[in-house]
Amino acid sequence: TQGVSAIRFVYEHNYPVIRDTIVSSVYARSIGKEVDGNAPELFGNELAAHIICGGPDVSCHETTTKKEAVEKLRYGVYMLMREGSTQRNMPECIRAITEEVLDSRRAILATDDMLAGDIATKGHMNDIIRRTIKEGVDPAEAIQMATINPATWLGLSELGVLAPGKLADIAVVEGELADMNVSEVFLSGQLVAKDRQLLLPLPAYQYPDIVKHSVKRKPVKPEDLMVKCDKSNPKVNCIGLILDQNLTDAFVEDMKAEDGYVKPDIENDLLPIANVGRHGQSDIGAGFVKGFKMKQGAFA
């Protein structure tokens, strides 16, 4: 599990992160600002401590199991059920509501990261609402999880419902509500999309110069991305991908080394991975990961 044990680990290796986080969190609370974060795999006393530090509206978008979802909802955590292109946690989390019949007012639908192609072909929030309904949630309740629930969590009392005195952008759904086929979109009272066609010009975004020169990095050599080793048959700590999850497995693998470096093992899907800082850091984190199943090439 994470939590206190993770804090100790980070403190041992990079104590300024913990120190700065505590100082900034205390300052934010002192001036009336919200403090929030994630709470993956937290239960019992550790979850309670996280909530006390975060305040009454603390949230988590890293919940991955029904057990976690049940406890967080019972503790009053706003649970953002993630269902994006690569992280798919909603079907497991929603069981806390469909099977345990818990109150859904603190359940929120979220996509986190979505590929542009997925948004174009499947939709965005309308797609996750559609999937939630297929998991057994009433259509009106599923829509609340994407509208009034997040508005309430963020303190945006003027948003989230169609009612006098409220602000609302409107998505018109055609046919069965459960299908979530959006036919028209109104933005600030103006019809901006109809039948999947944009009705107003959308100029290309102009990036400011400051973001065009933000990478501060010395040239990286191939050996900088490799794991040094003085043994010929080392035992190597590896990362294991979990399908549709952000969390990963950790395991030890017998590997081979030559010329002072551990060799990748493509046949067994043990591929090199590196974390290269872009803000002036000199250190590089290098290791091995299993699960990509790539036989050639690379990506960044």
Residue ranges of each PLM-predicted region?
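Histidine/acidic residue-rich metal-binding segments in metalloenzymes
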Residues: 3, 9-81, 88-109, 120-134, ...
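Acidic, glycine-rich active-site loops and adjacent beta-strand->loop/helix elements
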Residues: 85-87, 149-150
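Active-site microenvironment of metallo-dependent hydrolases
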Residues: 120-136, 140-300
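Flexible glycine-/small-residue-rich
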Residues: 2, 111, 275
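A short glycine-threonine-serine/GTX helix/turn-capping micro-motif
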Residues: 114-119
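An acidic- and aromatic-residue-enriched active-site/binding cleft used to recognize and process polar
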Residues: 40, 84-85, 112, 175-176, ...
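Mobile "lid/hinge" segments at catalytic clefts and subdomain interfaces of large enzymes
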Residues: 1-4, 188
